[in-house]
Structure formats: C-alpha cells, structure tokens
C-alpha cells in the first residue's frame, strides 16, 4: 500500500503542478494582453530555450545541495560515534539537536542558489531588456516564451524523475530481497 499510495500521490502532484502552470500562463497572457507568442522572433525563441533548460538546472542544483547537506550530516554522525562512547551499544544518547540544526541550516544555505535562480531569472528577463530599449510587448512575449519553456520541460522532467526514482527504489528493494545475476545470488552490501 505504501509504494502504491506514494506513486499515486506523485502522479497527482505532477498533474496539479502542470495545471497550475497552465493556469498561471493563461493569467499572464490575459494580464499582459498579448495575443500570441511569436517564436520566430529571436529573443522569444531564446527565452523558450532558456525556460526549457531551467527545470534541469534547478534539479541539478537541488540534487547537489542535498548531497552537500547529507555529507555535513554524515560528518556530524561520524564525529558523534568517535567522541561519544556508548552510542553503538545504546548506553549513551546521540546529540539529535545538532543533527537537526545541521539539517535545517544546510538545507536553507544550500537551496539559496536554486531559489535565487527561480526568482531572479524572470525578473532579469523582464527588466534587463528595458535597459536596452526593447519594446514592452516583445519583453512580454519573451517572458511568455520563458514560461512556456519552463512548463513543458518541467512537466516532462517531473515525469522522468518520478519514473527514474521508482526504478531506483524497486532496484533497491530487489537487492535487499536478493537478485540472481549470472547464476549468483546478490544481496544488499555486495559489489553489485
């Protein structure tokens, strides 16, 4: 029930995010009054590609952030095992509060760049062309192209990552139970 519920929940979350993105896009088009996005204009096409790239870049930055935060946690746990005798035997209590503190601080610190990217890039697209004297309608189309790229790429990337995560989870469970590879049973902790 747990995996099925999680998989169903992820599907609903992806569908909800896709519909929300489309609703925001429709609201943007209505608010700006643009009647279409002409991708034959080079700046608009460029922003479409930039938008398509953002979910991938954000995901890479977020995964790196998780890895760095996890390494900080591993170092703290190793320190506690070295310095506090009796943790492994269950006679001494670990310093849970330090682990929670590291987790909180590291997650906030490491997610600054992805957060700034998602907030700053649309603002940059909106205001930087004004410095160069571009027409406001072309800027509106550029932002629309950016939003379209983010929406399409983001939905596809979410589906891909959901499926990849499910495959990794199933592979992990298979190895925990034992998998036959080339006639040999392979278990968790083996070279496979």
Please report, for each region that a protein language model flagged, where it lies by residue:
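Hydrophobic packing and interface segments
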Residues: 1-192
């Amino acid at each position: 029930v747990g995996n099925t519920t999680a998989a169903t929940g992820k599907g609903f979350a992806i569908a909800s995010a896709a519909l929300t993105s489309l609703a925001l896009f429709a609201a943007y088009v209505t608010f700006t009054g643009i009647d279409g996005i002409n991708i034959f204009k080079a700046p608009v096409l460029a922003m479409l590609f930039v938008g398509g790239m953002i979910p991938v870049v954000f995901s890479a930055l977020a995964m790196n952030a998780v890895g760095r935060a996890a390494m900080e946690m591993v170092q703290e746990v190793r320190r506690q095992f070295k310095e506090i005798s009796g943790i492994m035997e269950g006679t001494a209590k670990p310093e849970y509060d330090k682990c929670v503190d590291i987790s909180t601080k590291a997650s906030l610190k490491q997610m600054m760049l992805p957060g700034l990217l998602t907030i700053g890039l649309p603002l940059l697209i909106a205001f930087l062309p004004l410095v160069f004297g571009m027409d406001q309608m072309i800027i509106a189309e550029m932002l629309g192209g950016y939003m379209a790229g983010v929406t399409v790429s983001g939905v596809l990337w979410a589906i891909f990552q959901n499926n990849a995560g499910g495959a990794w989870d199933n592979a992990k469970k298979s190895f925990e139970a034992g998998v036959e590879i080339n006639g040999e049973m392979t278990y968790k902790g083996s070279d496979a």
